[in-house]
Amino acid sequence: MRKFILTVLFAISYVFSVMAENEQATVDTSRVYNLDEIVVAPRNKEFRSLRLQPVSSTVLTGKEMSSLEVRDLRDISNYVPAFVMPDYGARFTSSIYVRGIGSRVNSPSMGIYVDDIPLMNKSAFNSHVWQLDRVDVLRGPQGTLYGINSEGGLVRQYTKNPMRYQGTDVNLGFGTRMYRNAEVSHYNKVNEKWAFSVGAFYNGTNGFWKNSLTGERTDDMDEAGSRLRLVYKPTDNLSFDWMTDYQHVCQHAYPYGTLDPESGKVLFEPDQNHQGKYNRNMVNSGLAVKYHGKGFDFHSNTSYQYLKDNLLMDNDYSAIDFVVVDQSQLSNAITQEFTFKDNLQGRWHWTTGVFGSYQWLKTTAPNTFGSDFSDMMKKNMRLDLAEAGIYNSILASMSARMPEEAAKAAIEKAGGVHVGVQMLVPCLFHTPQANIGVFHESNYDITDRLTATAGLRYDYTHSKIAYDTSGDLRLNFSIMGQNAMARVLSLYEHTESAGFSQLLPKFGLTYKFDNGSNIYATVTKGYRAGGFNIQMFGDIIQNDLQANSSVIMEAAQQAQSTHQDVERVVTQDEAKYEELYEGIKFKPEESWNYELGTHANLFNNLIHADLNVYYMQIRNQQLSVFTEDYGYGRKMVNAGKSYSCGLELTLRGSAVSNHLTWAVGYGYTYAAFKEYKNRASKNADEIDYGGKKVPYIPAHTLSAMVDYTFDTNLSFMKSLTVGANMNGQGKIWWDEANTYAQKFYAVLGAHICADFGLCKLNLWGRNITDSKYNTFAFSSKATGVEVFMAQRGNPFQCGFDLSIHF
């Protein structure tokens, strides 16, 4: 912390010394512009720039993201108030937390759009970002215009449009820990009607951590991809914009170390006997059609999305051979949206449209139980005593005819006496989901200063689950060369479905001032659809096999006495499936958001300030927790009632004739349970979590960035930019009981960029004070003993980027 404070003080003193040297300038032409004015993005549903709307938002330009060394959405979240996407150890995990809501599995809390394509599979959220022109982050429910799973807000990524941006970009990067990056993109406007862009990238790192048991790297990664975009404008009023993006990633994953929950320090390096791995291939393709008519604009967005991945996870996170999950997803999704909005000058502006989507998702997730699990089962089922009893019985019989030592030798020579247990849980799930939404929003200028906003969306989601899984328990008897197996197969094969419908209203008032500032108030409803849990079937099967212990023992006795294989099949009746339906289903999450804010232009546009306060009432909050009894998987549960309130502030400024630019962001979130009771295990007493803080939600988020550009008179260099940035967050509780947490931490970065005209060289450093912190922590009881694990934040890293444009 001392190093961090000294570094910040040095940076501040340096900035003021530079400003003092430039006081000789008689006229300061500094001005902060709305970023909507600098980087234009399509407004398919809105009429005004974001700072003129009644919404809390943050915009990052491509230039800012380059100086901040942004590589994915996790990096973007560091510079947006109250918006957190932590590093959980793999591209697979895309948890987003905002304004007190979020979860690690199932329905996301925010919607993600790339060039107006809504990403349907949560596993596609965490991907490499490149060719970006700008990113918009809208906080607060956006369901009226964007539908389900935008309860916390929306992220819109826009890539460079070849109609507006031309040339060839080559970006090369290299850093410590063998960070390497290469991107090549070409943008060509053939004529006034045709334009295209094509590009490819590679990104990789050797990572920071190693598996102390196997010696393998635990967080190294290689990923590559390409993107093609075609734009056709046959007339001034009609355009077609088609984009296809492909990405592949291959990485070692989940470098979780053993955590001391009291100190928050990681005591031991990762030591899993099965190193986690993640591989993913995905394609996102979309066609946008826009028509500018007389009195209205028409927009059509069609997309197809494909994702195929495989996740291997040591589910006990330890050196023992206990349980491994090998999960694969195959997802195909289509979306279609038609939007109409008026384009007339007048007091009334409206947007209306319809959205539909369908996603096919097939998941295979076999649980493989290892030798240490088998040894535990053998002991719990008293098979070790049975093995000893069989051996002693045979030994006593043979000892009556020969010396005991000779009898022992004869038994071993014949193959000995062995009783083993093996358990398999194959899982196959089909979970298709359909969604349709019809929406309308109107903005009416009551006066020249006061605008009223009202909107409504009807949203319907139909979720289905078809599962085919079983508990396959095998007892293997090997008695002096004679082998027999007792197999009990408990089958679960059923189909369930559920429908969820919702009306999502929005009300707002905006009052404008002469200098472009405004104040606003909104009331909006948020919504996350319900669905079905699939990761908890390992626990369900384990409980089922225990309930069928009499069947298992009867089969074992028959196999032992007949020396033949015996198989018993256990099926479930409708009453069992009805009980299971209630166990795997989770309800929709609903919320009401009340917000008051302002977008202020201060000191003749030297500073832009965006400030808002909000209060959210949440019902049936969706929480991701480990399954109670064994902890082999995670499931979504509903807390009865919760609430969150907070403040979000963003400041942007410019000085010294725009040579100095800076920004500060701060978010405060207080999120707590109002009514929530749960059990630590199936037979444990109920625990009341009322009044406890919602886990994984940082109470504070803080970010800052400052750049100063020196104009040079050198023939080979146009300018030199020196900058620093900081982001921090905390306190973060890691469990519902609020027993252990991550304290507030801050990470400092810096960069120096030399602009040579044709190319730019940027030297950068991340976490230059080498702060120690955890981005994720949890406890697991998979082995029967509770252990605490954590994902550490990345330590110091430095490198350079070379950008060439011609």
Residue ranges: model-predicted function:
Residues 167-169, 174-205, 213-251, 280-285, ...:
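Transmembrane beta-barrel wall of Gram-negative outer-membrane proteins
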Residues 95-100, 113, 134-137, 149-171, ...:
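N-terminal periplasmic accessory domains that precede
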Residues 210-216, 254-271, 316-323, 368-426, ...:
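Solvent-exposed loop segments that connect transmembrane elements
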Residues 361, 374, 527, 658, ...:
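C-terminal beta-signal and adjacent terminal beta-strands/loops
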Residues 341, 345, 351, 355-357, ...:
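Gram-negative outer-membrane beta-barrel transporters
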Residues 57, 74-117:
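Extracytoplasmic beta-strand/coil segments of soluble accessory domains associated
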Residues 115-141:
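Short acidic/polar hinge/loop motifs at secondary-structure boundaries
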Residues 288-313, 518-520, 542-635, 643-645, ...:
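Membrane-embedded beta-barrel scaffold of Gram-negative outer-membrane proteins
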